[in-house]
């Protein structure tokens, strides 16, 4: 929920009027409807899709305006390069750690051991589209895709990295022009206020979107679909929770704040992510709340959007854990060298994964298509439960990017500790 920092303190509204309570109630009602009337629940997918489309509609202008005004406000352009270097260094270190955690847990718990699945018996027709999407991915193709065909096409298509690329160039140009560009900067600052007010309006529909998305998930896949492969789902959830509380918790403590207080501060957004299974649905609110928590606008504008492509801790845990699950289920014994190769490939293929529903599955397909030891057809084993793991991936990704923003802001000396303390309580 967007809060106008300039507004006078208001009387605290009743609990039931908060976005947190409304989204939570919507999720519960969606689960009940999908369970009691699955045919009806399965028809409500458009509600969730429509809400995500509404949010995606506003993501491009939010990123563009925030990044441009943030860069234009930098005293020295050298600051931009330094912030980017620190951010990507953090992304690489923590993402690699997440991959290692997934690999370690899979080796210790061995969730796929004893299934003895013959690859020839698997029906891989359902993963053909994912495999094709993965095959189309390449490092060169990914880098070329960052450059839009035109300046306007980046905003029109809403690709996050393209919008970020254009915004950085535009912000640098404004900074180089200097005082003559001040009227343009002032106009963009006013547009930022308008766009975030629009975000607040769109968030009113969040409970409807969460209700439809959850009713569809339970209605189509059913609660019972978790039974056969529940071990993998439970293992992934516990691993992700442990990663957030222990790994990110330690990082947060070193940076001078509590991970639990940060999670409580972002509870509205986390419920929104849970209901829609998309961390993108809460991106505009995350940027606003990180600024309110004392992180400087240039830091927020650079770290949050890039983190949505390069700092996906939940997706990284999922990839190595799921890959080893498939190998174990198909009785493929991976040597240490093969597991290291898997980790290195996953480090590359995970970069650029979008924060939308199902992107983690495509990224896994991209990884397995490069690693010959693990059969891509084995992905058919987890296709039915991937939707249930998507929520956890998105939540972990979201918290990871919030932590990254505060950490980079602290490294840069661009963190208002008093604001952070007041926000987190």
From Swiss-Prot:
> Any one cellular component term from GO for this entry?
plasma membrane
Q: What keywords were assigned to this record?
A: Cell inner membrane, Cell membrane, Membrane, Symport, Transmembrane, Transmembrane helix, Transport
Q: How does it sit in the membrane?
A: Multi-pass membrane protein
Q: Does the keyword Phosphoprotein apply?
A: no
The biological process GO terms on file are: L-aspartate transmembrane transport
Q: Which InterPro entries match?
A: C4_dicarb_transport, Na-dicarboxylate_symporter, Na-dicarboxylate_symporter_CS, Na:dicarbo_symporter_sf
Task: Please give the family membership noted in the entry.
Answer: Belongs to the dicarboxylate/amino acid:cation symporter (DAACS) (TC 2.A.23) family.
* Record function comment: Responsible for the transport of dicarboxylates such as succinate, fumarate, and malate from the periplasm across the membrane.
Q: What is this protein called?
A: C4-dicarboxylate transport protein
Q: Which gene encodes it?
A: dctA
